[in-house]
Every structure is written in structure tokens, then in C-alpha cells.
């Protein structure tokens, strides 16, 4: 009888331990899964969102523009380039952006540079979300205009006039821009930057970063 009770107790402990392990493993799995799917690699999933260049004053999550954005807008338009380590679309766009701005950097670098572009100065930020600060990473959710939650993503911020106030005016585009080759992608981005410069010049006199 005592042996039977001992065996029952041992069996209970094994089952209880197994259930605890399952619960712990499930929590860990959910945490990992949430981290992985938080930002998708668009090309990995064979997704290519339609790229529409429509500027807006409203941030994607209703948060205020970060102070470093407001400050850099005193110099010229801003180009935010979001990437991650494992992302085929990011790899496609990486050399396109380097050609666009005549700049060299590593894929895991953090880059901030004010770059001459035609008759303007562009504040360029390269943000690899796997190797950046929380402040820069969080801007992805501020400017994910179409709520795609995918990479690569490119945000151009200029100045617009809204109800008597000059303030940040931005658009975000995604993936490989629905273009077939690098030449088309480069032409598309060049035109977008030219448009952002024109809008900026129309409104810069009325802007204050404070």
C-alpha cells in the first residue's frame, strides 16, 4: 500500500512538472513569437504593399514627433531608412539608398548624416531595428502611416502648412517600391525627394522647432 502511494505521488510530481514546463514554454514561445512578428520582413512573406506617396500631418500612432525630428527640420527634409538584419527586401534596397545619397555604411551600422542633395540638405537616418536605440526604433511606429508593420520602410518628412501653422508633413513607403529594377527605384526616390524639397522651400520661413 505504501509503495502504491509513493508511486502515485511520483506520478503526480512528474505530471505537475510537465504541466509547469508546458506553461513556461508556452509563455516563452508567445514572447518570442510576439517579438518575431512585431515587424515583418515584407519580401520574406512575398508581400509588396502598394506604394502611394500621400503626405499627412497625422502620425500613425498619434504620438508627437520626436524632438530630434523637429530640430533637424530646421536644416531641410528628413529621410528615415528602416531595415533589419534578415530581410531580402532590405538587401535589395540597401545599395539603392547608398547610390541615392552617395554614402557608404555597413548594414548593421547606425547612421546619421546631413547630406547635400541637389539644392538642399537632407538629414539621413539609417535605422537597423536590430542594432539601434529604443528612441529611434520607436519612430517606426510613429511613421508607419499605412500600419504595414513591415520592412524595409522609408519615411520622408518635410514641412507643410496646416490651418495657419507650419509643421512636419510626411509620407512612408514600403518594400521595394513596386518597381522592377534599381534604376526605377532610384528614379522614384529621387522624384519623391525633389517633391519634398519643393514643399519644404514653400513653408520653411514659417517654421520653428519649438
Describe each PLM feature range.
Residues 84-89, 129-134, 160-163, 176-179:
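Solvent-exposed loop/turn segments at secondary-structure junctions
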Residues 89-114:
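Typically the conserved alpha-helix immediately C-terminal to a functionally engaged Cys/Sec
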